[in-house]
Amino acid sequence: PAVDAVAACGSLAGRVVVKAIGTAHKTEAGRVAVGLAGASEVGAALDAMDLADDAEVLVEDFVDDAVVELLVSIRREPPVGWLLTLGIGGTLVELLGDTTSLLLPVDAAEVIVALRRLAGWPLIEGHRGKPPADLDALVATILGIAGVVEMRPDLVELECNPVLARPVGAITVDALATVVDLPVRRTPV
């Protein structure tokens, strides 16, 4: 609950991010605060969000070394199959429209070719003095997200945005899943 978030920030070192759970487009809705230092800033951010005391929030370490933010989305497209969409992400994804799509399954080489098709590829390579992204880690993260389709037959769509490509590593910091109820299969005994 939101009332526990202030206490939770004490267990994390450095600055934190506070997000309201279950809200799409958290930035526009005023349901995310980043770079907060200490309990007083977390408390003030929660007050500004005007959440119910029992609202669920997530407190996590603030990642400040992102080379670029990416969109990684998988979506069921009947009758074709699963579509993987990659793009320059974060809050700019709709504005820039810099995306490319592939049909699953894919391998690492296909993911790299797709990333290179993005107009924002130079950002991944390291642009204007920024270090390059850890391409191996980024590709592994993308393939891991794509692999979720095999584990979740109820999944319709999974949008990970942003996935932060870092000089060392990559991390998904927000995701939105759409699932459907599946009929229960009964096996005779």
Predicted regions and their residues:
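ATP-dependent carboxylate/acyl-activation modules
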Residues: 1-189
